[in-house]
Amino acid sequence: MSLERNTQKSSMGVRSMSARLARSLTGNRVRTNPVLDPLLSIHRQFHPRADVQVLERAYDTAERLHDGVIRKSGDPYITHPLAVATIAAEIGMDTTTLVAALLHDTVEDTDYSLDDLTRDFGEEVARLVDGVTKLDKVALGAAAEAETIRKMIVAMSQDPRVLVIKVADRLHNMRTMRFLPPEKQAKKARQTLEVIAPLAHRLGMASVKWELEDLSFAILYPKKYEEIVRLVADRAPSRDRYLKEIIDQVTGGLRENNIAAEVLGRPKHYWSIYQKMIVRGRDFDDIFDLVGIRILVDNVNNCYAAIGVVHSLFNALPGRFKDYISAPRFGVYQSLHTTVMGPGGKPLEVQARTHDMHYNAEFGIAAHWRYKETKGSHSGEQAEVDQMAWMRQLLDWQKEAADPNEFLDSLRYDLTSKQIFVFTPKGDVVNLPVNSTPVDFAYAVHTEVGHRCIGAKINGKLVALETKLKSGDRVEVFTSKDQNAGPSRGWQEFVVSPRAKAKIRQWFAKERREEYLEAGRDALAAVIQRGGLPMHRLFTASSMKTVATELHYPDVDALYTAIGSGSVSAQHVVNRLMAIFGDEEDAEDALVARTPFSELVNSRATTESSTGILVEGSPDVMAKLAKCCMPVPGDEIFGFVTRGGGVSVHRTDCTNVEKLKEEPERIVSVSWASEGQGSVFSATLQLEALDRAGLLFELTRVINEQKVSVTAMNSHCSEDRVATVRFTFAVSDTKQLGSLMTQLRNAEGVFDVYRVTSGG
């Protein structure tokens, strides 16, 4: 590897010397690789002073590393990174991005490391390639897809160029998708349509978004796509004639008013036409006949003047004027929109914007790097600031969402929902999803404003908090001064923004966690005290930390919370504390202390007179069944000699087995007598079932049919309607217990039945 690198460095030095010599002999005109001519030509249009030599070097490196690799299409692999870089160049990306695009697959697919990349092309290129590489490591499954999208948002928030390269990568893959198996095509197309294309749209990359949508449409719905294409081709000639008539009329009106402008027809996109047919329920002719034009001017004043000219030529439709210049959509899209009644009584959609606004609309946040190298950063600065604010918001969401799928659902909603803009009392613009309420507005301003919101005014009038906002509304919210103020559970019924939903859900989850933590701590202390166990030895910070780690909880508070929520029983935790820090004398005292008097009498009446246990083959030794694991005939068992001289009998899978076997000299062999002489033994089963009317009746019927007595029962139901029921039965052996478990599992709505200890 080192010899190859030294050879590479030597050849690079020769090439560099040759290049300098060529410049001196040819007046600084260097002959480039003809394969790169289209890429370099496009790049120079946006960045005339760009250093093209680094692009040549990047291409040479990528070509060498991918040498011999063939794509599914049969083309050399180098055609893919070259195409990705060309797409990035077409939207005006900077030289660094193009270098990263050329090299974006080298680290993942070859032995070229990030260190090599940093050494050869610098840290910035390496960071971009690393970001793209991490996005490409996609596992299978829905959860993996959601986690990948989450990673994409994190990478994008750190440097949006990572997403630009990823989108360009996806666009070229979609263009060549026909060479993949149909199922892979469908999977990629659906992800593109649901996430990648909306992300491109949200970042203002309209031209890329349209193509991604149409390519996905062709793969997912080929028959519908072909029909739309045919209809468009059939209607195109008459539509083009009508459009030319309008453009000529508008151009003439602008010229008469001394407004220098370019008037263009707006193209119709196949997926957009299909969506309007589905969503609006309208015929193809109605949608396709809706003609649109775009007026491009030199400055903002002429945008408004151009709309004035259009309104003088045609009758404006009421309520259809939208000013996205003073209140940009998504923080990046700026334009004036209006709809008028055109020739022949057909609606005409008109947009007016400056040339810079048009470029921003087509290429979005990517335009920032064009301005950065040509006009200074100020032209695209506000768009970048607003877009970065949106990406920071997404970053907050992904941190707050414990479940990646929850984050993906929120992202999909935010990307696909229509937006409104409202104003704060100070005149600041706040973008919200359509149907948002004052509560959504409050959370958009600040989390604490949302939590403490108690009232609102819209346009100076007091309104209910569930009132729906409209674009242009001026919103003022009133907050409580109470430090403990919080949201209402009822808000979850009407808020629509992902941020508001997440913040409200988190608040109640935190409130529940605190309640569970206190309840869990109290429950554990109560079990220890009730059992007469040494509090000073068991209930310490170090002992609790040990048990929390053993039970796979991150800390002691998490363990207390789990006890309080019912995820684990306090008795089970005490059993583990005893196994690690207690001794047999503590255990015996605890069993007596926590056993009800009536049960203790019944237990002694059976176990001491006829436990059915042979100790070392003899029935004469006093033995009693351990309450910690409740063995019944048929269980594998062992004996442990107590300090009082008796023998406690445990199941071999008892939770205390590890602690007891630390004193092997006290372990004795025990076995079940062949005849139990009619004795019964306690066994506890826990079942989980869908909560429904008649569940307990059904379970009772099954138990009665098995002729088994119930000595204790308790139950609780979770928020997701899962009922957990615990029964203690008097059974003769494991055979009867197993039959009972089978019949309970077969009961309608029962998910699972399993055996537990008396407290575990």
Curated annotation (Swiss-Prot):
Family: Belongs to the RelA/SpoT family.
Residue stretches spanning the membrane: none
Function of the protein: In eubacteria ppGpp (guanosine 3'-diphosphate 5'-diphosphate) is a mediator of the stringent response that coordinates a variety of cellular activities in response to changes in nutritional abundance. This enzyme catalyzes the formation of pppGpp which is then hydrolyzed to form ppGpp. It also has (p)ppGpp-degrading activities.
Species of origin: Corynebacterium glutamicum (strain ATCC 13032 / DSM 20300 / JCM 1318 / BCRC 11384 / CCUG 27702 / LMG 3730 / NBRC 12168 / NCIMB 10025 / NRRL B-2784 / 534)
Ranges for domain HD: 77-174
Assigned GO CC terms: plasma membrane
Stretches assigned to the ACT domain: 684-758
EC numbers, comma separated: 2.7.6.5
Protein name in the entry: GTP pyrophosphokinase
MF terms in GO: ATP binding; GTP binding; GTP diphosphokinase activity; kinase activity
Annotated PROSITE patterns: ACT (PS51671), HD (PS51831), TGS (PS51880)
A biological process term (GO) from this entry: guanosine tetraphosphate biosynthetic process
Catalysed reaction equations from the record: GTP + ATP = guanosine 3'-diphosphate 5'-triphosphate + AMP
NCBIfam families: spoT_relA
Xref: SUPFAM superfamilies: ACT-like, HD-domain/PDEase-like, Nucleotidyltransferase, TGS-like
UniProt keyword annotation of Nucleotide-binding present: yes
Keywords, in A-Z order: ATP-binding, GTP-binding, Kinase, Nucleotide-binding, Transferase
Domain TGS residues, every copy: 418-479
Biochemical pathway: Purine metabolism; ppGpp biosynthesis; ppGpp from GTP: step 1/2
InterPro entries listed in its UniProt record: ACT-like_dom_sf, ACT_dom, Beta-grasp_dom_sf, HD/PDEase_dom, HD_domain, NT_sf, RelA/Spo_fam, RelA/SpoT_AH_RIS
